[in-house]
Swiss-Prot record:
Monomer. InterPro entries: Pept_tRNA_hydro, Pept_tRNA_hydro_CS, Pept_tRNA_hydro_sf. The keyword Translocase does not apply. It comes from Parabacteroides distasonis (strain ATCC 8503 / DSM 20701 / CIP 104284 / JCM 5825 / NCTC 11152). Hydrolyzes ribosome-free peptidyl-tRNAs (with 1 or more amino acids incorporated), which drop off the ribosome during protein synthesis, or as a result of ribosome stalling. PROSITE patterns: PEPT_TRNA_HYDROL_1, PEPT_TRNA_HYDROL_2. This is Peptidyl-tRNA hydrolase. Belongs to the PTH family. The record marks 91 as: Stabilizes the basic form of H active site to accept a proton.
Length: 187
């Protein structure tokens, strides 16, 4: 089976380490965990890795966040991957920091990257792994918060959370979404 695993983030070194780029960070960790690496290809950085009997195309789009759907649609079509085998890794303000939630479908929850993907795929029925970044910001401070870097106390917890996110992605490919949600969403 072939899967497209896409981490959402903004391009540019000034965004590295920001909350909004946690999708890139998660897929970097996934690829490193199996000794793979990324190469620049059309619409983004691509890694081709294998997890047991699953072929994973791992994508970090090089489009702006709100145009991520262009990259996702291109790679689904190019690799002939069904939407059921798509997983988007995305930051989520509605979840406390470090909470990971796998969902089989859903709304964009105001996330412009997800909004664009749903628009270009003409469906919201694709899986997403939501990484909680919390919402500890004053009224009107959302943009500064998501584009801000993680504080030291959260960075300290990051390796364990990234390991767990990697386990979830591997399980999604090997066992399917329902078993993976049952196993990980309540932890």
């Amino acid at each position: 089976m072939k899967y497209l695993i896409t981490g959402l983030g903004n391009i540019g070194s000034e965004y590295w380490g920001t909350r909004h780029n946690i999708g890139f960070r998660v897929v970097n960790h996934l690829v490193e965990s199996v000794g793979g690496n990324f190469t620049e290809e059309r619409y983004g950085a691509i890694a081709r890795i294998r997890v047991k009997n699953c072929d994973l195309i791992v994508l970090k789009p090089n489009t702006f966040m709100n145009l991520s759907g262009n990259a996702v649609r291109y790679w689904l079509q190019k690799e002939n991957i069904p939407v059921e085998n798509l997983l988007i890794v995305v930051d989520d303000l509605a979840l406390p920091f470090g909470t990971l939630r796998l969902k089989p479908k859903g709304s964009d929850a105001g996330h412009n990257g997800l909004k664009n993907i749903a628009q270009l795929l003409n469906t919201q029925e694709y899986s997403r792994l939501r990484f909680g970044i919390g919402s500890d910001f004053p009224r009107g401070g959302q943009i500064d918060y998501v584009l801000g870097k993680f504080p030291p106390e959260e960075l300290q917890l990051m390796p364990e959370i990234l390991d767990r996110a990697t386990e979830i992605i591997k399980s999604f490919c090997l066992a399917g979404i329902q078993i993976t949600m049952n196993q990980f969403n309540n932890k």
